[in-house]
Amino acid sequence: MTAIIDIHGREILDSRGNPTVEVDVVLETGVIGRAAVPSGASTGVHEACELRDGDKQRYLGKGVQKACDSVNGEIYDALSGMDVEDQILLDKTMIDLDGTANKSRLGANAILGVSLAAAKAAAEESGLPLYRYVGGAFASTLPVPMMNIINGGAHADNPIDIQEFMIMPVGASSCSEAIRMGAEVFHALKKTLKDAGHNTNVGDEGGFAPNLKSAEMALDFIMKSIETAGYKPGEDIMLALDCASSEFFKEGKYVMAGAKKTYDQKGLVKFYAKLVGSYPIISIEDGCAEDDLVGWELLTDALGAKVQLVGDDLFVTNPARLSMGIDQGLANSILVKVNQIGTLSETLEAVDMAHKAGYTAVMSHRSGETEDSTIADLAVATNCGQIKTGSLSRSDRIAKYNQLIRIEELLGSAARYAGQTIMRR
């Protein structure tokens, strides 16, 4: 047993200049584990509660001093002296202490910071990298990156309704090669957009945010850029979308204001089917709104056999929500965001449940990130085979890619790149 002797939460800034929680967990041996908590822009209503101060005189009401007080007060009192290696008990103790269904009393941002920092302290104490400590001896699969190179929706100030247009270098032989391929396409896209007279400003996740009128225009630019970089779309590199459709679901209709189109559920599914038929799209995230279960059923029936349908707002990394979706046959994949559920052990439970049901899992960042690269380790620890961590710019995104490169180097000949194994046949 190695006891926790101190826990300290502090207010730091995320990649959008908003406050977030960072936690240090200190062990009796002097080892320190540190973790910073991410924050989302397009958030699901079923997510665990991120505790903000609401004081308009500080950080426009977005301060997290209350969450830090939770860490430094009640959580410290409850966990002090406990064994840092008993992750499940640590997390359960915090969940019980909070006493709410969505962690709203202490704040999921407070609880998650402690949960992740404790795991990192335990890994350090064990002399193991985090991916090995969490995942065990068989953690060796490097994920295919979903690289968000054009931003729309809530992540950018442009008319594009779909939130993310991503490339997936499935044809690479290694994760480091996939990252290189992605970087080359990113730079090709920048030149292609610039040559066409578009701005090359970047959005929250590092992708470009040009003033394009439709999803098809965005996809055409990406296809051209893949070819310009010397790769074959549909062979070397596939495409993926995050529609974030809860953001444009209004009174039972899907209102794409930028494209000036409104769809019912069947119409939206036909729109996606047309895109899938025209472009090498292998993954669609949040194709329907979080509570539009009828829409999800239609979408899964229409495209589930050939496209990965990822539930983000639908499942919010919550084992109970995922179990409901599995029972009803909704989607076929779960997006995994540690701050949606608020503890490491619940996150791992959701991934395990997905895999046992034949669903894929995609480890994911949030639009508000920090230099913390924990999710890179968790992607390898869970062998989930896919990671979504933004574009090939902004150091808050690059930190995760760089950590994957390091992990692949550490694994050496044992490393296996997921590549085309993640594609639905």
UniProtKB/Swiss-Prot annotation:
The keyword Ion transport does not apply. Pathway: Carbohydrate degradation; glycolysis; pyruvate from D-glyceraldehyde 3-phosphate: step 4/5. GO terms for biological process: glycolytic process. Keywords: Cytoplasm, Glycolysis, Lyase, Magnesium, Metal-binding, Secreted. Its cofactor is Mg(2+). Coiled coil: none annotated. Binds a second Mg(2+) ion via substrate during catalysis. It is found in: Cytoplasm; Secreted; Cell surface. Its EC number is 4.2.1.11. It catalyses: (2R)-2-phosphoglycerate = phosphoenolpyruvate + H2O. HAMAP family: Enolase (MF_00318). Catalyzes the reversible conversion of 2-phosphoglycerate (2-PG) into phosphoenolpyruvate (PEP). It is essential for the degradation of carbohydrates via glycolysis. This is Enolase. The lineage of its organism: Bacteria, Pseudomonadati, Pseudomonadota, Alphaproteobacteria, Rhodospirillales.
